[in-house]
């Protein structure tokens, strides 16, 4: 029996249209599926009886959607390199005229009036990250809070920029984009994560007189980097570190990332900087506990000798509108 053609980047998957172009008859395709492979989606053939991994499922979805389609939504974000908190459910694609919207299983094809721009990422055409993020939000693939977190992550990692994201938002209706807009505001105020945005909001509301800077580079007089605290209070020489096990656990190569995170806090002490660690859970559920600890640290720092340091690339947060406490 004939072997399936090995098409680059398709990982053993072939569309029946490609097989017909290669000279396969309908009966030959049917015999192959019955005897050796299987069809994960209509018009798509896989040459083994094993299940597909996530990457193969995306490729299969694209083969079903057609060569004029482009991946968008959650799986589009993953293809661009974003790590999502939850595995996307839908494989979502966009197509332009004369194609139509259609759905099968968890694969959805959405019709748009203009052909989408795309990049080929690992064999699959993918819309720009900003468009994928908007479709992810407006398609209700995640909650507004999750979209907010993904937006901040995309900006913080440099996968997009505020200008590009604002331009993309300006080309679409505002409904369904609240999480994106919130994340954009958070990032422009200096936050690199949702917990940091919560910290900024707490301090701006409850301790509005404190001068603070988000994610500044602190260097000593010789220009050597001391660290990049999540939040720095320069008048009191206090570094606030939001320590999340979710984001800092695990290994990078042979290095324990959590141990490195904790050890890094010790670098501030010789420079007269007090470190106040706080967890995202405390910021979210017990802000008063955090504020009591902060007040104690501020009091302890009064009158302590100051060591010369320099602040680089500090972001001054925009004052938040007042809220009722």
Predicted regions span which residues?
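Surface segments flanking catalytic/ligand-binding clefts of nucleic-acid enzymes
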Residues: 155, 159-325
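Short gly/ser-rich loop at a beta-strand->alpha-helix junction or flexible surface loop bordering the NTP-binding
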Residues: 1-176, 195, 299-325
């Amino acid at each position: 029996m004939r072997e399936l053609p090995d098409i680059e980047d398709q990982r053993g998957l072939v569309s029946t249209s490609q097989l017909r172009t290669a000279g396969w008859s309908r009966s030959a395709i049917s015999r192959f599926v019955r005897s050796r492979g299987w069809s994960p989606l209509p018009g798509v053939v896989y040459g083994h009886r094993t299940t597909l991994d996530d990457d193969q499922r995306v490729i299969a979805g694209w083969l079903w959607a057609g060569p004029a389609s482009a991946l968008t939504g959650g799986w589009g974000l993953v293809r661009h390199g974003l790590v999502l908190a939850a595995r996307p459910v839908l494989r979502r694609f966009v197509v332009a005229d004369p194609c139509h919207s259609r759905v099968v299983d968890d694969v959805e094809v959405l019709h748009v009036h203009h052909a989408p721009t795309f990049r080929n990422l690992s064999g699959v055409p993918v819309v720009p990250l900003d468009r994928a993020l908007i479709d992810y939000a407006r398609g209700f693939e995640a909650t507004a809070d999750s979209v907010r977190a993904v937006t901040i992550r995309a900006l913080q990692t440099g996968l997009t920029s505020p200008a590009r994201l604002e331009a993309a938002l300006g080309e679409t209706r505002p409904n369904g984009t609240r999480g994106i807009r919130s994340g954009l505001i958070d990032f422009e105020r200096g936050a690199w994560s949702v917990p940091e945005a919560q910290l900024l909001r707490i301090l701006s509301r409850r301790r509005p007189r404190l001068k603070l800077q988000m994610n500044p580079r602190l260097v000593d007089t010789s220009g050597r980097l001391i660290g990049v605290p999540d939040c720095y209070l320069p008048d009191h020489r206090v570094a606030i570190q939001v320590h999340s096990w979710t984001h800092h656990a695990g290994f990078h190569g042979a290095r324990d990332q959590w141990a490195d995170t904790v050890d890094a806090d010790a670098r501030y002490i010789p420079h007269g900087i007090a470190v106040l660690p706080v967890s995202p859970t405390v910021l979210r559920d017990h802000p008063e506990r955090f504020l009591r600890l902060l007040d104690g640290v501020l009091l302890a720092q009064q009158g302590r000798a100051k060591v010369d340091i320099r602040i680089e690339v500090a972001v001054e947060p925009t004052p938040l509108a007042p809220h009722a406490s």
